[in-house]
């Protein structure tokens, strides 16, 4: 999935912003969260998040659920590099493993446990 954030901002601008954020908030992780293509789940109101490094993926999913006001019976899945990360994994570990060359961690969310087409 191509990130809309990447399309809207140049690499240099994104890299400079991520570096500035990491210097100012060394214990936080800059995350870009966008809705996956072809899902009927609501669109999130903001894409940029500064998450504590000790936050788990499960806790981050909870934050996303609240932001999109998702009904409790509806499922939500988040993907990093088209992979479903473990719920108990720390966002700092996911960041170190999957951060983009611009310094942001790109996360997409969907109402289905699939990525792309079948």
UniProtKB/Swiss-Prot annotation:
Positions of the pro-segment in this chain: 117-118
Keyword tRNA-binding: no
GO terms of molecular function: phosphatidylethanolamine binding
Gene Ontology BP annotations: autophagosome assembly; autophagosome maturation; cellular response to nitrogen starvation; mitophagy; protein transport
Transmembrane stretches, start-end: none
Post-translational modification: The C-terminal 2 residues are removed by ATG4 to expose Gly-116 at the C-terminus. The C-terminal Gly is then amidated with phosphatidylethanolamine by an activating system similar to that for ubiquitin.
Intracellular or extracellular location(s): Cytoplasmic vesicle, Autophagosome membrane; Vacuole membrane
Knockout or disruption consequences: Prevents vacuolar accumulation of autophagosomes and affects survival during carbon starvation.
A Gene Ontology cellular-component term: cytoplasmic vesicle
Keywords of the record: Autophagy, Cytoplasmic vesicle, Lipoprotein, Membrane, Protein transport, Transport, Ubl conjugation pathway, Vacuole, Virulence
Induction comment: Transcripts accumulate during carbon stress conditions.
A matching Pfam family: ATG8
Covalent lipid sites (Phosphatidylethanolamine amidated glycine): 116
Site (Cleavage): 116-117
Topological relation to the membrane, as annotated: Lipid-anchor
Assembly and binders: Conjugation to phosphatidylethanolamine (PE) leads to homodimerization. Interacts with ATG1, ATG3, ATG4, ATG7, ATG12, ATG32, ATG34 and the C-terminal 10 residues domain of ATG19. Also interacts with the endoplasmic reticulum to Golgi v-SNARE protein BET1 and the vacuolar v-SNARE protein NYV1. Interacts with the UBX domain-containing protein SHP1.
Function: Ubiquitin-like modifier involved in autophagosome formation. With ATG4, mediates the delivery of the autophagosomes to the vacuole via the microtubule cytoskeleton. Also participates in membrane fusion events that take place in the early secretory pathway. Also involved in endoplasmic reticulum-specific autophagic process and is essential for the survival of cells subjected to severe ER stress. The ATG8-PE conjugate mediates tethering between adjacent membranes and stimulates membrane hemifusion, leading to expansion of the autophagosomal membrane during autophagy.
Family listed: Belongs to the ATG8 family.
Protein name per UniProt: Autophagy-related protein 8
Source organism per UniProt: Mycosarcoma maydis (Corn smut fungus)
């Amino acid at each position: 999935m191509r990130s809309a954030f990447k399309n809207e901002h140049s690499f240099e601008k994104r890299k400079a912003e991520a570096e500035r954020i990491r210097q100012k908030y060394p214990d936080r992780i800059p995350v870009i969260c966008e809705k996956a293509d072809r899902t009927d789940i609501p669109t999130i109101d903001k894409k940029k998040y500064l998450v504590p490094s000790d936050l788990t993926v499960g806790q981050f999913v909870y934050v996303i659920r609240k932001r999109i006001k998702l009904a409790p019976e509806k499922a939500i899945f988040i993907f990093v590099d088209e992979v479903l990360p473990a719920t108990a994994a720390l966002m700092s570990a996911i960041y170190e493993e999957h951060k983009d060359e611009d310094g942001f961690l790109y996360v997409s969310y969907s109402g289905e446990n699939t990525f792309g087409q079948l």
